[in-house]
Amino acid sequence: MTDIKFCGLKTGRDIAAAEAAGARWTGYVIFPKSPRHVSPTLAGELCHLARTSETVAVTVNPDDDLLAQIRDAMRPDWIQLHGSESPQRVVQARAYAKRGIIKALPVAEASDLDAANPYDRVADMLLFDAKPPAGADRPGGLGHGYDYALLKSLQISVPWLLSGGLDDTNVCAAVAAAGAKAVDVSSGIESAPGIKDAGRIAGFASALAAC
């Protein structure tokens, strides 16, 4: 069975739909440039609604002050670092926030996977996302995919998630190509940027279950 992280949730209805679809993780984005942004306070309120999923605070190059806000207001199970954080910063963030760390890494070509090695055993999990287009003002693939088969040759010891451009039409092929045991989806379950669709959430989970 392939585990799912439904990311960018903003309402209790989103959480209910994600957990009904079997989410292992639910993600809450704390980054003002994202259409999925929620404040640490709202993220904390949402986390209290999560009953069966592990909660993930998704951040981009957070300073210690923001990490403290997330830790205290949200109390997530995980913190996802989705910026240019160094391995040393990952170590510092884990020690400061006292939470498991998911480090996101951008992928466009095979050489990008070399960046994973310094984070192996430093982060608790890795997440491979599409490299953002040139000139983008925020990280992530922004709904775009990449050659998922590049991940088939990964040689790392920590668990990892496949992300970037996934939806119900391509998730089976992507998982097979990458050899992934867990996936992350956000824009692929939306009716508009930042607006989750319960039907698409259920459809994504059903498509993955049928692989």
Swiss-Prot record:
GO biological process: L-tryptophan biosynthetic process
Pfam families the UniProt entry points to: PRAI
Pathway assigned in UniProt: Amino-acid biosynthesis; L-tryptophan biosynthesis; L-tryptophan from chorismate: step 3/5
Listed CDD domains: PRAI
Enzyme nomenclature, EC number: 5.3.1.24
Signal peptide interval: none
Reactions this protein catalyses: N-(5-phospho-beta-D-ribosyl)anthranilate = 1-(2-carboxyphenylamino)-1-deoxy-D-ribulose 5-phosphate
GO MF annotations, alphabetized: phosphoribosylanthranilate isomerase activity
Keywords: Amino-acid biosynthesis, Aromatic amino acid biosynthesis, Isomerase, Tryptophan biosynthesis
InterPro entries linked to this entry: Aldolase_TIM, PRAI_dom, RibuloseP-bd_barrel, TrpF_fam
Keyword Transmembrane: no
Record-linked NCBIfam families: PRK01222.1-1 (NF002295)
Entries under HAMAP family matching the protein: PRAI (MF_00135)
PANTHER family given in the database record: N-(5'-PHOSPHORIBOSYL)ANTHRANILATE ISOMERASE
Family under the similarity heading: Belongs to the TrpF family.
The name this protein goes by in its record: N-(5'-phosphoribosyl)anthranilate isomerase
